[in-house]
């Protein structure tokens, strides 16, 4: 990540905090944990178990896995649930065991796998909790890892919302043998990887260690601040004076920007951060990095989702009449 300074600015440490230095109670309500989901429970059940074991009001999972599917299941804790839709932006990766119902030549198998790379059409399965309309999904990568008789082990990197069971069914039909998905494991879910996933029992043990012995070290290793789950987004760093206005949903203006990440375009989602590294909001850039650096006034990011609660930073802006299109007033930082 390369940040370009638009205007040097200092932050006041009387407000906000470094995300990695939050007290443990705040972390549990503004954090996340990546669970290694076991075979059996639903994703909703796993999220509910995490909520109950950590004594939270709410928790939500990012990306449903069928009961028999294992692997990386990110769980948003407390107020972090508002970040879940952002986790669906990057691709997901799976390792799948596919079983053919008849013999097939290696050359035919390889050709079918090539055919199913790129844009594909899918209709959600009957059990899906969404409307069964035809949709386009992108298969970025698909690689055969091993073939043993009629069993094919493969890895695929695909767009969020791709049904792997349906992908296997469709490939089996195209091959002329028919096929079914025997096993599936998610290895990457957006910005989260299976090697950082933790077992439910380990999370419970760490929580008990903190509650009974006051030892929060192990719990901090497992629970990450919400900002950890937004690291895949390009960043715009704002001055303290702009934070609370953005927390109220106001469009980000050029005068509130301190630093901009190189390479931002208008076709992506960007993260608005404080000078301390706290996530404030996400939004749609109205111009690219180069133009943001040049402009002295005007709107630069349209806010689409506010993350930080209002009131953490001081309010040093004035409400405008809804019909007033002029730039909001704020003090220089």
UniProtKB/Swiss-Prot annotation:
GO terms for biological process: box H/ACA sno(s)RNA 3'-end processing; mRNA pseudouridine synthesis; rRNA pseudouridine synthesis; snRNA pseudouridine synthesis; tRNA pseudouridine synthesis. The active site is at 66 (nucleophile). It catalyses: uridine(55) in tRNA = pseudouridine(55) in tRNA. It comes from the Archaea. This is Probable tRNA pseudouridine synthase B. Keywords: Isomerase, tRNA processing. Residues 233-308 form the PUA domain.
